[in-house]
């Protein structure tokens, strides 16, 4: 699946294989997965399987048409200290809730780029919901990304963890922080945007591979 969804240039960088070999691998992968055209009915059937995870706020859920959709990317942005990280902490708890309470009974993968993850805040949130904080913490897979390369690599290697740990939510907080600090000045802007674009596509690929 990863081969089918990965651009040839990225496979070449990671493996050192030639273009013809890569083309054959991608073609074989696509054939095996039956990637191509399909009917709108099948697209609709797939869309019906999308679930919503509550944010814990009725007003915010209403803005998001019922909560955060699985199988896609949502960006929260705003000024410093406006509660973005707190929402991400809450989502790591809420994703574990039963469906009837707004969750999807899954685990969370948290990629922390700024060192702002606080287990004690998770514990406070679990107490408010009368949950076992030890179990909730066990169901949050945590990784600290120290630079943009490390961050990109963690996302690329997330597929196995997603399968093993029933991951239904991936948090990257913050997604562009490292890129902003490492690629400074107009001369680096194009490269920075290209890397961010590819990073987002890697995340979207995970959504497709693990719906």
Task: Set out the residue ranges of the language-model regions.
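Substrate-engagement module of ASCE P-loop NTPases
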Residues: 191-211
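Small-residue hinge/turn detector
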Residues: 1-4, 18-19
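Hydrophobic pocket-lining residues that define ligand/cofactor binding sites across diverse proteins
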Residues: 95, 99, 162, 207
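Conserved inter-motif catalytic segment of the P-loop NTP-binding fold
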Residues: 103-189, 201-202
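A conditional alpha-helix N-cap/helix-loop micro-motif detector
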Residues: 53-57, 85, 148-151, 189, ...
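The Walker A/P-loop phosphate-binding site
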Residues: 10, 14, 25-135
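Residue-level recognition of specific faces of alpha-helices
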Residues: 2, 73-75, 139
């Amino acid at each position: 699946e990863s081969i089918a969804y990965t651009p040839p240039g990225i496979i070449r960088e990671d493996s050192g294989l030639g273009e013809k070999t890569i083309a054959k691998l991608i073609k074989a992968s696509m054939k095996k997965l039956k990637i191509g055209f399909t009917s709108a009915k099948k697209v609709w059937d797939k869309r019906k399987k999308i679930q919503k995870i509550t944010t814990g706020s009725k007003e915010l859920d209403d803005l998001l048409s019922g909560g955060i959709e699985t199988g896609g990317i949502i960006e929260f942005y705003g000024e410093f200290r406006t509660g973005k990280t707190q929402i991400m902490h809450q989502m790591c708890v809420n994703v574990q809730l039963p469906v009837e309470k707004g969750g999807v009974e899954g685990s969370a993968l948290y990629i922390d780029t700024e060192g702002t993850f606080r287990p004690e805040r998770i514990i406070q949130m679990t107490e408010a919901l009368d949950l076992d904080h030890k179990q909730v913490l066990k169901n949050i897979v945590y990784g600290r990304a120290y630079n943009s390369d490390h961050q990109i690599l963690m996302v690329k290697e997330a597929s196995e963890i997603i399968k093993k740990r029933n991951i239904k939510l991936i948090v990257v907080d913050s997604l562009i922080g490292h890129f902003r600090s490492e690629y400074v000045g107009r001369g680096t802007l194009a490269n920075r945007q290209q890397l961010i674009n590819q990073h987002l596509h890697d995340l979207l690929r995970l959504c497709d591979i693990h719906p």
